[in-house]
Curated annotation (Swiss-Prot):
One of its GO terms (cellular component) is cytoplasm. The lineage of its organism: Bacteria, Pseudomonadati, Pseudomonadota, Alphaproteobacteria, Rickettsiales. This protein binds to 23S rRNA in the presence of protein L20. GO terms for molecular function: rRNA binding; structural constituent of ribosome. InterPro entries: bL21-like, bL21-like_sf, Ribosomal_bL21, Ribosomal_bL21_CS. GO terms for biological process: translation. This is Large ribosomal subunit protein bL21. Keywords: Ribonucleoprotein, Ribosomal protein, RNA-binding, rRNA-binding. Part of the 50S ribosomal subunit. Contacts protein L20. PROSITE patterns: RIBOSOMAL_L21. The gene is rplU.
Amino acid sequence: MFAVIKTGSKQYRVAKDSIIKIEKIDGEPGSTIEFKEVLMIGEYSKPSFIGTPIVKGASVTAQILNQLRNQKVIVFKKKRRKNYRNKRGHKQEVTQVKIIDIAKASNC
């Protein structure tokens, strides 16, 4: 079974026991969180159930593993012949979570 969840401004396709990196969520490592915005639930042998826009009653439970920072992204700006160079780096804070359970709604 898999699900598509929305957290932050992104959508993620998750399955049970999968480990994903999402935008930073406050919480200690080891604590559990629940995602209520489930956009789609599906099984590999059956047709998928797509929400309008979310699946009512469905939820995904996850456990926080780590609070991390992604790899550095370099932003470099230059204007030729003007001696203008600007180099900056940015590391986005992310949360690594493990999907524990996908709960279907009664109408799925």
